[in-house]
Amino acid sequence: MIQHTNARQSSVAIAPLRQLVSDSPEQWGYWLGRKHYSLEVVQHPLRARMCGFGDKDRRPLAPAAVAKMVVRRDDNSIVDVDDMDCSFFLVTVDLWSEDGKHETNLVLHPSSVDRHIPPHSSTKSRRRGTSSSAPQSRAPANQTPSGGSTPTLSQHRPGEQRPPLPHPHASGYNNQGYVTPHAPQVNDALGFPPSTPYGPTQADSSWGYPPPPPGDRSTSFPHPTLPSIHTLGRSPSSSTSDHWNSEPEPQSLPYGAWNTDAPYHPSISSYSNSQVDPSVRNHSNSEGIENPGWSSSEATSPHSQADHAAYESSTYHHSAYHPAPTHSQMAPGTCSSQHVSTVPPPPRHTYTRTLVGPLSANACRLLDEHRKPGIFFLFQDLSVRTEGTFRLRMRLMNVGAPPAPEVGAARVHNDVSPVLAQTFTEQFTVYSAKRFPGVPDTTALSIALGNQGQKLPLASDGLSEALVEESSRVQQASETQWFRV
């Protein structure tokens, strides 16, 4: 059954055609030049079966939504179809609620809903949200017997002297050219982790270095094994490069000298005294051999400089870019990580389109079931993912370059296109697979448009097939008579 909407009276036909009833959705037209453009829904969808969240099972709305463009002059007369250029007219469609007040174009995809993690979950699930480093496992050992709480930043006053931290690999390494104040031994939980920044040391790896020999290295110091050129190329330090360039290059070196005009590491002086460990600060001060303030008593031998360069290429740049965490910095992180581990992560929602199918339609000059020409817009392949009651909002626009929408436009413009008209369909219901009552009968307008080459979904029952055949015979007879005249 063909249903017509927007039954206008002559007193309000020239006005912007807004609904007088506040409960109905907003429908209007637009004046452009001396012509008024409006949309009429000549066929409303009645029901559909929900298509779900897949892309293969399509359940189109039945019957298909069809809109018609109406153009009027100042005297309320309708412009003939042959006097209009419909090449650049199109209608867009989107999904709205049953009252036409809220859009429902997006729906939450069911696969994106994260499950709630209970606070008392297994140990394995709690470890995923916390740090897997060694200081966390030793955190209970730092608790005092009386309070039983981990020290925080507020417990360390700014003026309080903090014990300096030992430098990594400090055991077994003797500073040859300078004296570093001996740091008191502190707990392992307050210092560096037992592993090196680059993983376990291997003898055959270009990133590893052989362990230092036992005993006093100042008495018998062999020639150091220099790192690979790839390792030195990655090192940000260039403190001893000037001395190496002045010495004759040994034959065992597979590479030559490199340029050290521009430093590749930030100056250690940019860090404040409270951020840099004393051992690191003293270590960095000893590397500036270009500084004229150095005394001759602090100069080192070539062997100590080579060993110092091999040592600092593997450890110093890591401590310069990432200062050693102090006790006050690690304790709050340990407490917060244990507390955050019980809180579930925020859900990651993924939304998808509720209305599936082509959301725009081009204008087509067709004949309706009464053999009257018109400019129609067909939406024959629209599906809805979820069940409920909805409406379709349709908007008319013209995308042609001037003089569009008048006759003579030859191309599409690149500017913003104004909306010329807006209208809504009547309410339709989307059912689940079990509650779907069935596809409605094919309408006469669908048969008439299908006979003109438009692909519309038609019912497969015997009555609809008979109507299609009868309409086809009438269509052919009328076309033959029209051509003879």
From Swiss-Prot:
Velvet domain: residues covered: 33-459
Any Gene Ontology biological process: sporulation resulting in formation of a cellular spore
Keyword Cytoplasm belongs to the record: yes
Keyword annotations of the record: Cytoplasm, Nucleus, Sporulation, Transcription, Transcription regulation
Pfam families: Velvet
Region (Disordered): 107-353
Gene Ontology CC annotations of this record: cytoplasm; nucleus
Entries under Gene3D superfamilies matching the protein: Velvet domain
Primary location: nucleus
Entry's induction text: Expression is down-regulated during fruiting body formation.
Cellular compartments annotated: Nucleus; Cytoplasm
Biased composition (Polar residues): 134-155, 234-243, 267-304, 326-341
The keyword Transmembrane is assigned to this record: no
Family designation: Belongs to the velvet family. VelB subfamily.
Quaternary structure annotation from Swiss-Prot or TrEMBL: Component of the heterotrimeric velvet complex composed of laeA, veA and velB; VeA acting as a bridging protein between laeA and velB. Forms a heterodimeric complex with vosA; the formation of the velB-vosA complex is light-dependent.
Function of the molecule: Component of the velvet transcription factor complex that controls sexual/asexual developmental ratio in response to light, promoting sexual development in the darkness while stimulating asexual sporulation under illumination. The velvet complex acts as a global regulator for secondary metabolite gene expression. Component of the velB-VosA heterodimeric complex that plays a dual role in activating genes associated with spore maturation and repressing certain development-associated genes.
Protein name: Velvet complex subunit B
Lineage, highest ranks first: Eukaryota, Fungi, Dikarya, Basidiomycota, Agaricomycotina
Gene: velB
